[in-house]
Amino acid sequence: MGSKRRVILLPTLGVVVLAIAAAVLLHAGEAADVANGQFARASGTRFTVGGRPFYSNGFNAYWLMYMASDPGDRSKAAGVLQQAASLRATLVRTWAFSDGGYRPLQKSPGVYNEDMFMGLDFVIAEAKKRGLYLILSLVNNWDGFGGKKQYVQWARDQGHNLGSDDDFFRSDVTKQFYKNHAVLTRVNKITGVAYKDDPTIFAWELINEPRCQSDLSGKTLQAWVTEMAGYVKSVDPNHMVEIGLEGFYGESMHKNFNPGYTVGTDFIANNLVPAVDFATIHSYPDQWVSGASSDEQVAFMRKWMADHIRDSAAVLRKPLLVTEFGWSARSNGYTVAARDAYFRTVYDAVYASAREGGACAGGLFWQVMAPGMESWTDGYEVVLERSKSTADVVAHQCARIAGLSPA
């Protein structure tokens, strides 16, 4: 896709020119907000930047730090961030963790790989140059890049008797490991700005997709979220905090809205924690209701979004972001046209909410990859240069979202 985008045809050439010029000016204003030190805030059910409403569109690229840590692959990270700016996206979500294993950020508790940290420095600096905000996730629930499993193993290596990976949420040892993770106070060696003082960071995410199957009551995760959200805020009061939830309901209300099971989270109770600034959901009906038809899966997604948008406004009174959604090429009946239609359906729901002053203020699809990353594919990847129709859908949403933000 590069720096090109599809022009949506309007009745007259003059209107087309004015619309494109307005969108460019809006993105230039958002870029200036990042450059001029404007932190994103949550105000009621809206995000604001510099006192003005802020709406977002963008994507996930979890691998940015990893690729940027290798000078030979750094262009992949820079190229994808440039694509985001060219599309007039405003927000990218990525990992600020890699625990143990091959080329880690954190080799062992509190011991860091400077090359990997320099990769994260580079990502933040490049995002800032392009007027992009970043959501940085601090640890993984899953085994990829270490995750809670690695934290538990580190505790065991020190002689602590932890039974399951879910003890990550309960053990004082692993909780201290988490608190000691030095990302928040890192001083970027490219910009000279501490992460906690850098407005390029939109929000900290406590953990990617937390689940606690050993305590489906939700009490374990509720206690952990309360403690860690408060801790992150105590170290960094400048930035917003979100949990990283997929959106599964729990004991407080609406368990019947789940896709047939619970995972130890509680969308309502977890997000009502005062130190949590906004709610998130993910949407993967091709996984969660895999036995349903494509039409039934899309219907589930529509209801999933509508329920969470309503509850974010009426119960939480906080903004909502769809921080992951996608459609896998490995799903039955997949076509690029079907994926594009799914993206449009998600985007229409996001846009309708944002336009009408609802709680949902943006969506980030999973995920963008750069050319030459074939070994990283998971079925959900979008290589924008090779997926023109999907890139057009994304560009159209970016333009619509930009049009909602006052100049």
From Swiss-Prot:
InterPro entries per record: Glyco_hydro_5, Glycoside_hydrolase_SF, MAN-like
Which GO-annotated molecular functions does the record name? mannan endo-1,4-beta-mannosidase activity
Catalytic site positions: E209, E324
Recorded hits in Pfam families, A to Z, give: Cellulase
Q: What class of enzyme is it?
A: hydrolase
Catalytic activity reported: Random hydrolysis of (1->4)-beta-D-mannosidic linkages in mannans, galactomannans and glucomannans
Q: Which annotated residues bind substrate?
A: W95, N208, Y284, W366
Question: In the Enzyme Commission scheme, what number(s) does this protein have?
Answer: 3.2.1.78
Subcellular location, record wording: Secreted
Q: Which GO terms describe its biological process?
A: polysaccharide catabolic process
Tissue localization of expression is: Expression not detected.
Protein family according to the UniProt entry: Belongs to the glycosyl hydrolase 5 (cellulase A) family.
Q: What is this protein called?
A: Putative mannan endo-1,4-beta-mannosidase 9
Q: What is the lineage of its organism?
A: Eukaryota, Viridiplantae, Streptophyta, Embryophyta, Tracheophyta
